[in-house]
Amino acid sequence: MPDLKRAIGLMSGTSMDGIDIALLATDGENWIERRASASMDYSDGFRARLKAGLVDARAIKDRAERPGLLRQLEHDLTLLHAVAVHDFLHEQGLQPHEIDVIGFHGQTVLHRSNESLTVQIGDGALLARETGIPVVYDMRAEDMRHGGQGAPLIPAYHAALAANLPLGLKGPVVFVNIGGISNLTYVGEDGALIAYDSGPGNMLIDQWMELHGHGRFDPGGATAMSGSVDRNTAHRYLEHEFFKGNHRRSLDRGDFAIPAKGELNLADGARTLAFVSAAAILKSASHLPARPRTYVVSGGGRKNGALMDELTALAERQGAHVIDADNAGFDGDAMEAEAWAYLAVRSLCGLPLTYPSTTGCDKPVSGGVPVRP
């Protein structure tokens, strides 16, 4: 039996809807025992503060800067994560001393890969003090210091999952995470690992629904299911410079914008943006060394029926199968949080978090800042 560490992963993604929490035991390599998971939603008021913080973050020139609301926001965000950990431990009947490490992502407020600048607010030292558990945080920065894009970081975890795929899943396999921004991880039959952001995920759909006063997202894709794809609008998105050439890069929330209000009706806009999210995955996958046979989909976007219908139809045209991560034996909601727990253990062990084929860094790079209570 390898030396396993109990780790909690905390993820607050680009959708800014709350905190995902996951517990696993791992050696930081191929031994993974997935345990419990949970989530905690942000209040509408706190979500509004996060969005205001994105505006303040535009002024950042150095990643240590916290202009405007960001200093207080970072403090309050960290305390919310501490509450989430305490509640989770209570629900699971665990004590802080039974957890070896927390992997703390924080909230990305700025990501400019072309400037080697990424900023995630979240005070790891404060979280360690509040929870009484060692914390590893700020896991993207070291990758950027070595010429990487700082994203995506989840591929190391995907590679470990791919080593234990359920029977019947044919490779090459692509793990797709559809959060605010989508990313994919290709695991070749020869073990090749390639990853990059693939395009907008839920982000544009969520913004479109909010623009029309219809909530924060499209539940189940119901609005999109009643609409039709506007091909001209979809074509415009898919001709974006992000998709051109062979050089892949990571994305920021500001790289794509929603159509103007009135350009499309609510349902057609939602359907068009769902199609764009799906088509972006296949378009980005065209840069891979071999055509995928299976797409394993995690993240909130897999719950949008229209997006999944479009993705399934597009993939089937290429002879590929699309499967919800839950139906493949994984946890589609907790996969990113699980990854952050796994990466925290890898960081403590000095193992790489990123590779030249996943972020463009100049060599396999570990990372993260460890702090103790």
UniProtKB/Swiss-Prot annotation:
Keywords: ATP-binding, Carbohydrate metabolism, Kinase, Nucleotide-binding, Transferase
Pfam family, one: AnmK
GO biological-process terms attached to the record: 1,6-anhydro-N-acetyl-beta-muramic acid catabolic process; amino sugar metabolic process; peptidoglycan turnover
Enzyme Commission number: 2.7.1.170
Binding site for ATP: G13, T14, S15, M16, D17, G18, I19, D20
Pathway the protein contributes to: Amino-sugar metabolism; 1,6-anhydro-N-acetylmuramate degradation; Cell wall biogenesis; peptidoglycan recycling
Reactions catalysed: 1,6-anhydro-N-acetyl-beta-muramate + ATP + H2O = N-acetyl-D-muramate 6-phosphate + ADP + H(+)
Top EC class for this record: transferase
Top-level division of the source organism's lineage: Bacteria
GO MF annotations in UniProt: ATP binding; kinase activity; phosphotransferase activity, alcohol group as acceptor
HAMAP family: AnhMurNAc_kinase
Similarity comment: Belongs to the anhydro-N-acetylmuramic acid kinase family.
Purpose: Catalyzes the specific phosphorylation of 1,6-anhydro-N-acetylmuramic acid (anhMurNAc) with the simultaneous cleavage of the 1,6-anhydro ring, generating MurNAc-6-P. Is required for the utilization of anhMurNAc either imported from the medium or derived from its own cell wall murein, and thus plays a role in cell wall recycling.
Name under which the protein is recorded: Anhydro-N-acetylmuramic acid kinase
Originating organism: Brucella melitensis biotype 1 (strain ATCC 23456 / CCUG 17765 / NCTC 10094 / 16M)
